[in-house]
Regions:
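Helix-turn-helix DNA-binding segment
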Residues: 296
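Residues in the recognition helix of alpha-helical DNA-binding motifs
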Residues: 299, 306
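Structured, helix-rich domain cores that form ligand/interaction pockets
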Residues: 1-288, 309-352
Length: 352
């Protein structure tokens, strides 16, 4: 499903008047206007959800926010095509009177015209995985915080946990809240997130929905400007539902659980210097405090390649002889669109 989008639309026909939420004016020391910047205008859509729009000039329109949530009041399920999502949001903006003229008057006749005129600077592809029990989601998140890492991303591939007040999720590829110009992978418990950012009142207390959400692990792949440019994905015409699914799957496949697969044959072939560094890590020591900086990163790279173990992540302590360790397999499956989705959408429509 598509979540957050930032897009700039080059309008085939100009706007008759500016579209903004006011102006920021900067004066120099003599009181002369030095610069004027149009501010984003917040437009409230379905069930108090909002998009931000701004026209830097009469020939351009910027749209930022969650188009699926703006149109239907939630982002629990929805379209996986960013062009479809953006067009639906544009139609809603027109219906709300947020645009000075109809879309047709701007030369935007449908999704195909929009795809030819727009350019993306951020696209979030997301999906939810469903566990059998709510506490399985918390167990997976704890494991990701301790042992998760993004392959071949260096320090930015390490986990950055969220505060519990924000839902207790974890971000890979940059710190939480940091604008990602490349890619980020974000995990959080959807059941907790809807307590921080409540659902519309008409569905917020639905027991069937809340039980389902409590078992959902949200997995968001955030694609920034540099990545979209590198992959030729700034043009909406390059996007389909299949493309969004490919981007999500590719990023998820880069996720490793540090040291989850032991490879004794690879360990036997390590040079002595790498065995020493790996042995220090196994013993619970911090190799970064033992070796010079450049040496540590050389060792880290080579051990990561040979063993799929990142010695920059502290090793989990082994249980003592008095403790019998238990491991269990947690199965997560695609949540998809639940059986009761039509009922929830009908409630939202009747209370919209």
């Amino acid at each position: 499903m598509i979540d957050f989008i930032s897009a700039r639309i080059k309008l085939p026909r100009p706007l008759p008047v500016p579209v903004n939420g006011g102006l920021f004016v900067r004066f120099d020391e003599h009181g002369e206007v030095e610069r004027t910047t149009a501010l984003r205008k917040r437009v409230v859509g379905s069930h108090e959800t909002a998009l931000q729009i701004r026209a830097p000039g009469v020939h351009e329109l910027e749209v930022t926010g969650n188009p699926v949530k703006f149109v239907q009041g939630h982002n629990l399920w929805g379209t996986s095509c960013p062009v479809t999502a953006l067009w639906a949001a544009m139609v809603r903006l027109e219906a709300l009177g947020a645009l000075p003229v109809p879309l047709r008057a701007l030369g935007l006749l449908g999704p195909s015209t929009l795809a030819e005129s727009a350019e993306f600077s951020r696209v979030d592809c997301t999906a939810m995985l469903l566990a059998d029990r709510w506490f399985d989601v918390e167990t997976v998140l704890r494991s990701l915080r301790v042992a998760g890492r993004l392959r071949d991303r260096g320090a930015s591939g390490l986990p950055y946990p969220w505060p519990e007040s924000q839902g207790g999720g974890v971000t890979f590829g940059g710190r939480p809240g940091q604008s990602a110009r490349h890619r980020q992978l974000v995990f959080y418990a959807k059941g907790k997130e809807v307590k921080v950012h409540p659902l519309p009142e008409c569905i917020g207390d639905d027991p069937q929905l809340n039980e389902w959400l409590a078992r959902c692990l949200r997995c968001e792949v955030r694609l920034g400007t540099n990545y979209l440019r590198k992959r030729g994905l700034r043009a909406p015409a390059m996007w389909t539902e299949e493309r969004a699914g490919m981007e999500w799957t590719e990023m998820m496949e880069r996720m490793d659980m540090n040291g989850s697969e032991e490879r004794p044959e690879a360990l036997a072939g390590l040079p002595p210097r790498l065995k020493a560094a790996y042995g220090a890590w196994l013993a619970g020591m911090d190799p970064q405090s033992i070796f010079p900086r450049s040496t540590f990163y050389d060792y880290r790279r080579d051990i990561l390649k040979a063993l799929a173990v990142d010695i920059a992540i502290p090793r989990q302590s082994e249980p003592s002889a008095e403790i019998v360790p238990f491991r269990r397999v947690i199965e997560l499956r695609p949540a998809g669109r639940p059986d009761f989705a039509d009922r929830i959408d009908a409630l939202l429509a009747s209370n919209g």
